[in-house]
Amino acid sequence: PAEIPQEDFFAGVRLSRDRLFRGSYAMCDAPLGHIQTDKPNTAYDYDAIIRGENGSENEGGDTIQIQYGTGVKTVKLSAADGSYIPHKPVISHEVGQYDYFPDFDEMKMYTGPLVPRYLDIFRERLEEKGLYTQWRDFFEAVGAHCTQCYKDEIETALRSSELSGFQLLDLQDFNGQGVSLVGVLNAFMQSKGFITPEDWRGFCDSNVLLAKTEKYVFGAEEKPSVEILLSSYGKGKIKSGAVQYSLRSDELDINGSVESTRS
């Protein structure tokens, strides 16, 4: 990594080959991120990675492939100190490398000079495989999965106290060169129907309540251990003190308060 003196912050995706502070990567930018490779959880964060506590060294001389424009480029690895620690705020770049399935109903929305040729290509490929009649099922399944991945990725960033912020790859689909259907909104800034603005702000807002646990699924005999965190990027400072909580379900109604342990 190179820190430029006039920069106010460091924006990137890794501090060495294995010190990754983004949750997902294209194969040309391997190794892949924790959301692609690890067991689903809400405990992972980037703090040790940014502080250099689990750093590794590149010996130099080897070559790797990296994303370059819409293709790949082979570059030579230089020697890098795995203990490198940034001296400026760290921003995670292009978070959200999740490709939604194309919505073919969107084709009729192109009424001007721009023609969605990429949708024609995708349709032709599905027709060749005899799968076009199932595209709506694929769209719904992939969309639900991608939206959950977005949630996991953003919550990981918010759990990381050493990470100062993140830049989304895009909130909407990009239908220009290469085509990236990575948005929860389509190219016309319209919802794809997988999440409401209110639910999105539940994990992407100035103040977000987070539950930190090692896994999503617990056995009947297991006792879950959950740490509750509050991520606050708002203008005002959150005062420490007693925090009131309420847990409700069809069979549960628990209310109480607990003293906060850190600010």
Where do the PLM segments sit?
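Substrate-binding/catalytic cleft of secreted carbohydrate-active enzymes
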Residues: 1-185
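Intrinsically disordered/low-complexity terminal segments and short unstructured peptides
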Residues: 41, 195, 259-260
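Generic structural signal for residues positioned in beta-strands
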Residues: 91-92, 208-210, 244
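Generic beta-strand/beta-sheet core signal
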Residues: 93, 169-172, 203, 231, ...
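Intrinsically disordered, low-complexity coil segments
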Residues: 174-184, 191-195, 251-256
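Proline/serine/threonine-rich low-complexity linkers at boundaries of modular beta-sandwich domains
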Residues: 189, 193-208
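Short beta-strand segments of immunoglobulin-like
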Residues: 213-218
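Beta-strand-rich binding/interaction modules
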Residues: 221-263
